[in-house]
């Protein structure tokens, strides 16, 4: 089983979008039994909060539910548990270092680095552009799944 953890600052916008987009892609490919997919935050600010409403609505526009998801903070144990820890941006990578250290097993990457457009996933918290974030997340998750097949 391949275990993937998507990570952003608060775990209420980008990383849960990636979690549920990837779950949807995996299900549509008939591969659900081969994957465990989750998401987490680097900060404590949003722990216990549901997915931010505009992010939830963007997923729903595409027939994807994130019902029941609440934010949680990543832990050092996540590094041992997951095969891939996928950050949404460079700030997330820096903040993840306190949990994962030097990444000796090379499990950590940026989602967009799996595409032909490396870099950060657009942060809708600052831009308000959930469509741009959707496009980045969909492109990143599609490319990651292709890599892992």
Regions found by a protein language model. Give the residues of each.
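Conserved active-site segments centered on acidic
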Residues: 1-81, 146-149
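Phosphate-binding/catalytic loops
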Residues: 84, 90-149
């Amino acid at each position: 089983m391949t275990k993937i953890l998507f990570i952003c600052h608060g775990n209420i916008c980008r990383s849960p979008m990636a979690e549920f987009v990837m779950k949807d892609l995996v299900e549509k490919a008939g591969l659900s039994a081969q994957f465990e997919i989750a998401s987490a935050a680097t900060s404590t600010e949003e722990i216990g909060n549901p997915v931010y409403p505009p992010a939830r609505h963007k997923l729903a526009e595409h027939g994807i539910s994130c019902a029941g998801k609440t934010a949680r903070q990543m832990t050092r144990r996540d590094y041992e548990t997951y095969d891939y820890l996928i950050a949404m941006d460079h700030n997330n990578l820096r903040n993840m270092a306190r949990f994962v250290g030097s990444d000796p097993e090379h499990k950590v990457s940026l989602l967009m680095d799996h595409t032909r457009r490396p870099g950060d996933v657009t942060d809708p918290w600052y831009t308000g552009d959930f469509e741009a974030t959707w496009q980045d997340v969909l492109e990143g998750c599609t490319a990651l799944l292709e890599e892992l097949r």
